Amino acid sequence: MLKAVIIDTSAVARGLLNTVLLDGGYDVVGQTHTCASGLALLIKHHPHIVCIAREQIENGEDVVREIKTNWPKTLIFMVSSEFDAATVQAAHAMGVNGFIVKPFKADTVLNTIRNTVIAMVKRQRAALAKEAGAAAPADDGAPAAG
């Protein structure tokens, strides 16, 4: 089961997203209203997924960098009621993996997370296959000496 942490100043938004994630089979190991306490939850639980309100990211861009540095495999989802192209581009450049739109629609939230997880796994497998291919000795077609 994938573990998740929610960071949002709105208790209502945290509660709704918590319900969506729990109903979707995720283990919400913590939720908080500040990035500082959110980072403490990451240290304690090492979640696979972090959902962070847009305001939290925009007020403290270092939080995304810190998560990417210390938990590089953790997927970061920006949560907001609106996204424009500039925001999405800036968020991607910071390392945000996906976007969750308020008001929450359970199917959309769960599909967004699932599709992002699948894409990440595919990228990791491709990278491993590429590494394995580069590390494999070249076969020149000559018979083995023996």
Segments (PLM) and residue ranges:
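Two-component/phosphorelay signaling modules centered on CheY-like receiver
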Residues: 11-30
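Short hydrophobic/Thr-rich beta-strand motif most characteristic of the beta2 strand and flanking loop
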Residues: 26-35, 41
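Short amphipathic alpha-helix used as the core "switch/output" element in two-component signaling
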Residues: 40, 61-73
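Conserved phosphotransfer microenvironments
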Residues: 48-65
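Alpha4 helix (beta4-alpha4-beta5 surface) of REC/receiver domains from two-component response regulators
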Residues: 62, 83-98
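C-terminal output helix
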Residues: 86, 104-113
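CheY-like receiver
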Residues: 118-146
